[in-house]
């Protein structure tokens, strides 16, 4: 590419992100990118700008030293691409990003005045828990085509189809009736039997007598778009809907190649063409997902014999085994019983050398496994329990609940919690059609951008680690392992699955094929 054209495109790319290059920085970049083809230029410039934005910038004027550091970081990440094929990311290793309303971008924790998270959170952590959930949904909703301000000079019909969000403070400051308003807020029950709508500016009592609820499971502590009118200090709701979802590609178009997901990669793995190529070429890759692996049940261990014998000619990439790992939780002998059960599973795995040597085993603890209560995120099973198993099965990882798995360019979230029943029990208004609960459930999770949109007394969360339960940007695969009936639902380019309870569902499990992004329902019957 001609140097002048390359220089022009480089300067334009930085200007689009609100950055200006010093002449020395422009010259350095033009020389560094001289050998890059026109097809690769846009991708490489995007990565360099992302690396620049990660640095603490004093102004939008970019010096040569900043650009040099960014290019060096990108060069290292290119060399490390092959190491990024498969990564398991525990909840406590997930990076935290905080949305800055003034700059309209997500900043890493290190570039903010927030303290590092701790298990023993402060009162500020609890307040910020809800504030951050609100802020993420607010910025996402504001960008939706229905809520973006109409373009000056656009047709009246187009302007008429736009909506404007109001704050509760605006309503409370009005002395007369305010009709036809839409408010984004959280449903709360500040007084017994009376529901309120809350946002960062205030609270207002709700009148639900005439409210129509769109599809979804509307629980306390979930965020809604409430449409109605305000009169006499009461918001009379006509309709409730959830904040609109957006595909991962749309989120990344706004925020660039930030690695929200976690893992060793500096930028989002979606940007790596080598990983995409590996993913497409490896058509035999598969993930076997099983939940409620009751290792103390002889029948369950027998079924694993059958499963491993079937898969041994073509071992899966990974077995994802979710708890509970005992059928009878608690008790003074639970820890020793679990150690013995894991020893039995290791014996079975060692009988199949092809699986033992090439498949990975990921263990996600369940709500009734030994641990520190039922607060999320849950740490892995204790090392004292798993030490012998890990020595015998080297490719095994005992991780947190929830956890994340990155395979090539695909992002997978695993969460083991009996969530469907909890959400149904805590609904403000149960859906009129209970036939399609999985669809309602999946829509709720993705719209809320959170794995557990429930009150903290129903589903406790470590306040400072609430960000680890985010489902934003939307992953490629969301596994919510629940004792509810197995299901597979696609929403917003995200595949959401529940493998069901292995012993309770007739030994059903799911198999995910990353290259085609398909899920296969499987069952061990008649063996």
From Swiss-Prot:
This protein's GO CC annotations: epsilon DNA polymerase complex; nuclear body
Keyword DNA-binding found: yes
Record's subcellular location: Nucleus
Highest taxon of source: Eukaryota
Alphabetical list of InterPro entries matching this protein: DNA_pol_a/d/e_bsu, DNA_pol_e_bsu_N, POLE2
Annotated keywords: DNA replication, DNA-binding, Nucleus
Any Pfam family matching the protein: DNA_pol_E_B
An example molecular function term from Gene Ontology annotations: DNA binding
Main location: nucleus
Gene Ontology BP, a term: DNA-templated DNA replication
Function: Accessory component of the DNA polymerase epsilon complex. Participates in DNA repair and in chromosomal DNA replication.
Quaternary organization: Component of the DNA polymerase epsilon complex consisting of four subunits: the catalytic subunit POLE and the accessory subunits POLE2, POLE3 and POLE4.
Annotated family: Belongs to the DNA polymerase epsilon subunit B family.
Additional detail: In eukaryotes there are five DNA polymerases: alpha, beta, gamma, delta, and epsilon which are responsible for different reactions of DNA synthesis.
Protein name, UniProt field: DNA polymerase epsilon subunit 2
Organism this protein belongs to: Mus musculus (Mouse)
Gene: Pole2
């Amino acid at each position: 590419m001609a140097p002048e054209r390359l220089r022009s495109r480089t300067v334009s790319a930085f200007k689009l992100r609100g950055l200006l290059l010093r002449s020395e920085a422009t010259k350095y970049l033009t020389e560094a990118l001289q050998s890059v083809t026109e097809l690769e230029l846009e991708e490489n410039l995007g990565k360099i700008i992302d690396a620049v934005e990660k640095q603490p910038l004093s102004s939008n004027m970019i010096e040569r030293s900043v650009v040099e550091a960014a290019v060096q970081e990108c060069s290292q990440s290119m060399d490390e691409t092959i190491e990024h094929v498969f990564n398991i990311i525990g909840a406590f290793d997930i990076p935290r990003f905080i949305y800055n309303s003034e700059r309209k971008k997500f900043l890493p924790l290190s570039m903010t005045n927030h303290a590092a998270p701790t298990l023993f959170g402060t009162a500020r952590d609890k307040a910020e828990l809800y504030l951050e959930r609100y802020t993420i949904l607010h910025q996402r909703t504001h960008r939706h085509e229905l809520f973006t301000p109409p373009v000056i000079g656009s047709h009246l019909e187009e302007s008429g189809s736009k909506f404007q969000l109001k704050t509760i403070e605006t309503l409370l400051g009005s002395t007369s009736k305010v009709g036809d308003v839409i408010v984004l807020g959280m449903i709360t029950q500040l007084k017994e039997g009376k529901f309120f709508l809350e946002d960062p500016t205030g609270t207002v009592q709700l009148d639900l007598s005439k409210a129509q609820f769109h599809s979804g499971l509307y629980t306390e502590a979930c965020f809604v778009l409430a449409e109605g009118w305000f009169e006499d200090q009461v918001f009379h709701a006509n309709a409730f809907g959830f904040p609109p979802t957006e595909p991962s590609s749309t989120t990344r178009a706004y925020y660039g190649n930030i690695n929200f997901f976690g893992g060793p990669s500096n930028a989002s793995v979606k940007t790596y063409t080598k990983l995409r190529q590996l993913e497409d070429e490896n058509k035999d890759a598969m993930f076997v997902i099983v939940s409620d692996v009751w290792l103390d049940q002889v029948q369950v261990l027998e079924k694993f014999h059958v499963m491993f014998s079937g898969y041994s000619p073509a071992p899966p990439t990974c077995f994802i085994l979710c708890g509970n790992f005992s059928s009878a939780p608690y008790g003074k002998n639970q820890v020793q019983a679990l150690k013995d059960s894991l020893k039995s599973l290791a014996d079975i795995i060692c009988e199949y050398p092809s699986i033992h040597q090439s498949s990975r085993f990921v263990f996600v603890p369940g709500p009734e496994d030994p641990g520190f209560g039922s607060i999320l995120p849950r740490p892995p099973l204790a090392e004292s329990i798993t030490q012998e198993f890990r020595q015998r099965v080297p490719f095994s990882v005992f991780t947190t609940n929830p956890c994340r798995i990155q395979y090539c360019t695909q992002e997978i979230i695993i969460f083991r919690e009996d969530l469907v029943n909890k959400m149904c029990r805590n609904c403000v208004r149960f859906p009129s059609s209970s036939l399609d609960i999985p669809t309602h459930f999946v829509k709720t999770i993705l719209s809320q951008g959170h794995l557990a949109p429930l009150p903290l007394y129903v589903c406790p969360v470590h306040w400072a680690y609430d960000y680890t339960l985010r489902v934003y940007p939307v992953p490629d695969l969301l596994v919510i392992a629940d004792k509810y009936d197995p299901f597979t639902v696609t929403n917003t380019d995200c595949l959401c699955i529940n493998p069901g309870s292995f012993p309770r569902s007739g030994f059903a499990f799911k198999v995910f094929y990353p290259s085609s992004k398909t899920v296969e329902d499987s069952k061990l019957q008649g063996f």
